[in-house]
Amino acid sequence: MKNINADDTYRIINKIKACRSNNDINQCLSDMTKMVHCEYYLLAIIYPHSMVKSDISILDNYPKKWRQYYDDANLIKYDPIVDYSNSNHSPINWNIFENNAVNKKSPNVIKEAKTSGLITGFSFPIHTANNGFGMLSFAHSEKDNYIDSLFLHACMNIPLIVPSLVDNYRKINIANNKSNNDLTKREKECLAWACEGKSSWDISKILGCSERTVTFHLTNAQMKLNTTNRCQSISKAILTGAIDCPYFKN
């Protein structure tokens, strides 16, 4: 097994920074897959919109039959990689989950993946600035006796690439889906103080404006967030990262 060259890592990082489309990102993912001596890759990021709704963004070259079955059977509910990535940051080798299932009646996603050619693999959890999470996974169609060594070498290089990958992937897709729904600084301020339990009158005194102005900004924020009341606006703004603690910074 050939060790990963540091120059390859640096080259891929620079190539990712030059990406202008998801097709470009796919090519970089393919290069990364070859670099770690695997066949398949999957970049998946789950973006929450509410406590019950989310969007899933995926770039991959997984076998189509497996992807179709995975979606049709709603295996995301039982996928230990998804569950692990939601609450962890460290890379994980799939063989840890091979004999585990949520319960005896639940499907063992790792074992079922093997029947579709994803025999061995490992994943790197991803966490985004807007409360999204996901994973970057690599897989092989054969039982590789060196999988632990492949995993170890990948752990020394892939984490160096992931920040650039996630940042540029986000920029590309924000540019492709640009809208006029970004909250203004004043709308964020009003929502933030509403988070602290302040009334419109309280907020008006804190911000030095009229109560009517505060109501105006909160109503605009509600329209942009597609919510029906102040409480829902607050929870959705926090959940989706529309507002966060450092918003006071200029």
Curated annotation (Swiss-Prot):
Keywords attached to this Swiss-Prot or TrEMBL record, sorted alphabetically, are: Activator, DNA-binding, Luminescence, Quorum sensing, Transcription, Transcription regulation
Please cite one Gene Ontology biological process associated with this protein.
bioluminescence
Q: Name one Pfam family in it.
A: GerE
Oxidoreductase as a keyword? no
Where is the HTH luxR-type domain positioned along the sequence?
A: 176-241
The reported result of mutating N250S is:
In strain: ATCC 7744
Q: Does the keyword DNA-binding apply?
A: yes
InterPro entries recorded:
Sig_transdc_resp-reg_C-effctor, TF_LuxR_autoind-bd_dom, TF_LuxR_autoind-bd_dom_sf, Tscrpt_reg_LuxR_C, WH-like_DNA-bd_sf
Q: Which residues bind DNA?
A: 200-219
Q: Which SMART domains is this protein grouped with?
A: HTH_LUXR (SM00421)
- A Gene Ontology molecular function term of the record: DNA binding
- Effect on the protein of changing E211K: In strain: ATCC 7744
State the similarity comment. Answer: Belongs to the autoinducer-regulated transcriptional regulatory protein family.
Q: What does this protein do?
A: Transcriptional activator of the bioluminescence operon. Binds to the OHHL autoinducer.
| Name of the protein in question | Transcriptional activator protein LuxR
Species, as recorded: Aliivibrio fischeri
